């Protein structure tokens, strides 16, 4: 089987094909430049991230796809999963600017920090109430890529934990205070991650 490996990093988006254990067809493209970088806010157009990822991946024939992404980034979407914000990078510091301080317990698997997505969402709630009022769904970068391919907002628990919204002990997601108040990040007990199967633009491959 041919496995397509994609790593969406902060500097480059990297690709490789694993076939029988050997890596081939390696390629990389620069991660899109930020649309906003003012020393506090660091935002990237999500459409540009998807376009760069799929432009190369669509040319590669594979049986399935493995995706890793930078963590601590997120975006908010409306009731139809349409983005309300750009991708807000781990380099964003709006929570510090808004003086957000949250109690983040050990069960979250992370700690309070300026780039914690949960703290960033709280900053948006305080500073942009009109935008927050429209928010119905929270995505990590990984879960938005999965949604683009499968229609499901799903990610691995390691990505979920980095958001600050996940209880790693009970494997449950916390309310994001967005409209739906439903579980937006999923894991399957027993193998520590999300089991997702769908068909998308990656050559009809299986995710």
Task: Report residues per predicted region.
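N-terminal glycine/serine-rich phosphate-binding loop of ATP-dependent small-molecule kinases
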Residues: 1-86, 134, 183-186
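Glycine-rich phosphate-binding/catalytic subdomain of phosphoryl-transfer
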Residues: 55-207
């Amino acid at each position: 089987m041919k496995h397509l490996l994609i790593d969406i990093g902060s500097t480059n988006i990297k690709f490789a094909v694993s076939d029988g254990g050997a890596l081939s067809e390696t390629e990389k493209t620069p991660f899109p430049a930020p649309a906003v970088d003012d020393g506090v806010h660091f935002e990237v157009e999500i459409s540009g991230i998807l376009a760069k990822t799929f432009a190369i991946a669509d040319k590669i024939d594979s049986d399935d796809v493995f995706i890793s992404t930078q963590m601590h980034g997120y975006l908010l979407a409306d009731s139809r999963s349409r983005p309300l914000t750009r991708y807000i990078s781990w380099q964003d510091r709006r929570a510090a600017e808004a003086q957000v301080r949250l109690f983040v317990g050990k069960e979250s698997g992370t700690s309070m920090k300026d780039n914690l997505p949960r703290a960033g969402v709280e900053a948006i709630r305080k500073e942009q109430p009109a935008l927050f009022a429209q928010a119905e769904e929270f995505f990590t970068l990984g879960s938005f890529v999965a949604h683009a391919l499968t229609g499901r907002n799903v990610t691995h628990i390691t990505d979920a934990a980095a958001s600050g919204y996940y209880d790693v002990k009970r494997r449950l997601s916390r309310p994001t205070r967005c409209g739906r108040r439903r579980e937006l990040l999923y894991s399957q007990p027993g193998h520590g991650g999300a089991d997702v199967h769908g068909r998308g633009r990656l050559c009809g491959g299986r995710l």
